[in-house]
Amino acid sequence: MKGLDELKEEIKQEASDNPEKFFATDVLREKGFSRGQCSNCGLYFWAKDKDREICGEPECGDGYTFINDSPTSETLTHTESWELFEEFMVDRGYKSIDRYPVVARWRDDVEFTGASIYCFQPYVVSGEAEPPAEELIIPQPSLRFNDVDNVGITGRHYTNFTMIGQTCFKDGDEYDQDRYFRDMFEFTVEGLGIPEEKLILHEDSWGGGGNLGACMEFFVDGLELFNQVYMFYEQTPEGYEELDLKVLDMGMGHERITWISNGTETSYESVMPETLEKMKEKTGLEIDQEVWEKFLPHSSELNIDEVE
């Protein structure tokens, strides 16, 4: 029986060989993006600069380059960043639904809700149950205790965060890959005001909860803002097979949108500024700002899961 990592690698390779099958390549070319392969890690990516040689991963570039230099058109509070996304997507026909519980009582393979797509696995994704809407958005509180060692190190990790979902459930003929991709691309450029030249889009694959598919990761200045997964497959003992529905699973860290719009040293200063100030006051902690600002742009490279 093949493991999930092996299956993900197979899908990633198929997508690399035939990107038109999985990705919105017509939209990318319409926007003036070209496909390249990272000279450092070998990953395929799309960028406005046709001569670009490296992908957007912080390990392949200069870490976080948005610190003290936010690329967005305005600074957003944590509440405002959700409201901006919600208004933008509702105007485009998505239904905004309420969050699900963080205890995943409808599943027998996990205890906690770890991402927005968990809310719909396995029964909605498999077609056994009706979705609350065919095209929806959701601000889903998510728990990830496997990230404990990264909290406070990378500047972006939490054990309790909000995964904003753009989720769609459609029959094959009704599934509109180009539109779903365009909606998120234009939210980034028009909604957040990030210049197209800042966007680096990675081809990859994702799997979890018994499903998997190719995906497109959106990077800006060394930070992955969100990941749009084209969840077309169900994992089986023999490998994987196509789902009856075509499922879109975009997951965006709410905290990262707030962070990149503020350009603070870590996301915590943007998401919970009052809490941090209170903690400094209570502990008497004084931060060496010069050392802090030199170190934190490179904290992106300290993901415990990815370093030796």
Regions found by a protein language model. Name each.
Residues D17-E20, A24, S34, I67-N68, ...:
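Generic signal for short, ordered secondary-structure residues
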Residues G36-S39, M216-F218:
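Short acidic-hydrophobic surface loop/beta-edge motif
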Residues M1-R29:
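Short, intrinsically disordered terminal segments enriched in charged and Pro/Gly residues
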Residues F66-E308:
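Structured aminoacyl-transfer and RNA-binding surfaces used for tRNA recognition/handling
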Residues C38-C41, C55:
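Short cysteine-rich clusters marking metal-coordination/redox-active sites
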Residues D49-G63:
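Cysteine-rich micro-motifs
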Residues T25-S34, Y44-D49:
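Short, flexible, mixed-charge glycine/proline-rich loop motifs
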